[in-house]
C-alpha cells in the first residue's frame, strides 16, 4: 500500500495508482488517454470528498499523526519571513522537540514557538518524537517572557503526543516545568494565539497552549490522553482505541461545540499533507485576522479576556 495513504483511503490509493499507470503510457501517441485520466481524477475527487465527509474520530486521530503531515518548521517556512531560531533554556540544555524564535508575520514581529517531530529516524530520535523534556518547556517560557519584554505577540503551534515521561525528565521536574508555563502564560501582557496542527497531547500540549485564541486544524486532535491510553485504562486493551476516541470528543468540531476551540481551520481535501502550502495559507490568514483583533485590547482587557476564557471551560 502507498505509505501516503491510510487504510481507509485504500479506494483513493487504487484510483491514484490507475492514474499513474495511464500517465506512464501517456507518451504513446497512438493512445488518447487524456479523457480517461480526467475522468479518473474527477472520480478520485468525488471519492475523497465522500470518504472525508464521514470520518470517524479514530480516523481523524490517525490523520493527525500522518507521517507526511506538515510540522511546525514546515509552517514557519510557508507563513513567516526572517525566522531566527533561538536555542536553550539557560538552565540545562537545548531541547530539539521545541523550536522557537523571532520572525515576521507580514510586517509584524512575532515570537513563534512549536513542537517539532522528525521525518527520518535520526531526526525523530533527536527531536524525541515531538515529546519535550523540561528544558524544552523552559526554553519556551524564556522565549515567551522575551516576547512580552519586547512587546511581540506569541504564536504557538501544538503537535505532540505528550510531554516526555522518561525518568530523566522526571528528575528535572517535568510537572513543575509544565505548571510554571501555565502560570506564566496566563499572566503575559501580550497576545497569544495557539494553533493545534496535529496531535494535542495532554499537558505536553497545554504547556504552550494557554492563549487568547485557540485554533485547531480540521484533522487535528486535542485530548488529555491518547485514545490508546484511554482504552488501555478503561477496557484493558488498546484495541478499543476507536471507541475511546469517539467517547473522548477529541476532534476539532467536537471541541468547537464545547466552546474550548475558537476556530476550526479547514484543510485541503485529503488533509494538510496533500497541499501544505494551501494549509499554511489558511493558517496565515487566520493568524493575521486574529492578531489584528487582539491588538485592539489594552493589557488589562487582554488579561481579563484570557482569564474569563479559561474560567469558562467546563461550564
Swiss-Prot record:
This protein's UniProt keywords: ATP-binding, Cytoplasm, Fatty acid biosynthesis, Fatty acid metabolism, Lipid biosynthesis, Lipid metabolism, Nucleotide-binding, Transferase
GO MF annotation terms: acetyl-CoA carboxylase activity; ATP binding; carboxyl- or carbamoyltransferase activity
Signal peptide: none
Catalytic activity: N(6)-carboxybiotinyl-L-lysyl-[protein] + acetyl-CoA = N(6)-biotinyl-L-lysyl-[protein] + malonyl-CoA
GO BP term, pick one: fatty acid biosynthetic process
Pathway(s) the chain acts in: Lipid metabolism; malonyl-CoA biosynthesis; malonyl-CoA from acetyl-CoA: step 1/1
Primary location class: cytoplasm
Keyword hit for Transit peptide: no
Residue runs in coiled coils: none
GO CC, one annotated term: acetyl-CoA carboxylase complex
Stored PROSITE patterns: COA_CT_CTER
EC main group: transferase
PANTHER family attached to this UniProt entry: ACETYL-COENZYME A CARBOXYLASE CARBOXYL TRANSFERASE SUBUNIT ALPHA, ACETYL-COENZYME A CARBOXYLASE CARBOXYL TRANSFERASE SUBUNIT ALPHA, CHLOROPLASTIC
Purpose: Component of the acetyl coenzyme A carboxylase (ACC) complex. First, biotin carboxylase catalyzes the carboxylation of biotin on its carrier protein (BCCP) and then the CO(2) group is transferred by the carboxyltransferase to acetyl-CoA to form malonyl-CoA.
HAMAP family: AcetylCoA_CT_alpha
Name the record gives this protein: Acetyl-coenzyme A carboxylase carboxyl transferase subunit alpha
UniProt source species: Pseudomonas fluorescens (strain Pf0-1)
Lineage: Bacteria, Pseudomonadati, Pseudomonadota, Gammaproteobacteria, Pseudomonadales
Amino acid at each position: 500500500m502507498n505509505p501516503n495513504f491510510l487504510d481507509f483511503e485504500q479506494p483513493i490509493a487504487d484510483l491514484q495508482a490507475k492514474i499513474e499507470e495511464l500517465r506512464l503510457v501517456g507518451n504513446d501517441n497512438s493512445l488518447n488517454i487524456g479523457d480517461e485520466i480526467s475522468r479518473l481524477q474527477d472520480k478520485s475527487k468525488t471519492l475523497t470528498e465522500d470518504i472525508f465527509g464521514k470520518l470517524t474520530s479514530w480516523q481523524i486521530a490517525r490523520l493527525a499523526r500522518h507521517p507526511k503531515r506538515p510540522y511546525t518548521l514546515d509552517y514557519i517556512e510557508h507563513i513567516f519571513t526572517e525566522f531566527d531560531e533561538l536555542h536553550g533554556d539557560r538552565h540545562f540544555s537545548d531541547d530539539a522537540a521545541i523550536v522557537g524564535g523571532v520572525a515576521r508575520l507580514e510586517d509584524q514581529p512575532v515570537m513563534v514557538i512549536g513542537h517539532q517531530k522528525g521525518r527520518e529516524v535520526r531526526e525523530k530520535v533527536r527531536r524525541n518524537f515531538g515529546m519535550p523534556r523540561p528544558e524544552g518547556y523552559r526554553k519556551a517560557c524564556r522565549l515567551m517572557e522575551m516576547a512580552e519584554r519586547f512587546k511581540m505577540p506569541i504564536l504557538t503551534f501544538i503537535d505532540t503526543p505528550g510531554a516526555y515521561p522518561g525518568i530523566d525528565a522526571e528528575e528535572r521536574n517535568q510537572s513543575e516545568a509544565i505548571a510554571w508555563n501555565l502560570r506564566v502564560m496566563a499572566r503575559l501582557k501580550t497576545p497569544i494565539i495557539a494553533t493545534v496542527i496535529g496531535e494535542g497531547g495532554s499537558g505536553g500540549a497545554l504547556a504552550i497552549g494557554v492563549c487568547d485564541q485557540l485554533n485547531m486544524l480540521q484533522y487535528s486532535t486535542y485530548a488529555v490522553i491518547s485514545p490508546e491510553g484511554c482504552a488501555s485504562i478503561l477496557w484493558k486493551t488498546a484495541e478499543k482505541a476507536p471507541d475511546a476516541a469517539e467517547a473522548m470528543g477529541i476532534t476539532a468540531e467536537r471541541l468547537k461545540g464545547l466552546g474550548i476551540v475558537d476556530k476550526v481551520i479547514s484543510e485541503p481535501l485529503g488533509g494538510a499533507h496533500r497541499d501544505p502550502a494551501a494549509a499554511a495559507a489558511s493558517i496565515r490568514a487566520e493568524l493575521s485576522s486574529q492578531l489584528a483583533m487582539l491588538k485592539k485590547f489594552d493589557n488589562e482587557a487582554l488579561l481579563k479576556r484570557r482569564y474569563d476564557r479559561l474560567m469558562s471551560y467546563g461550564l
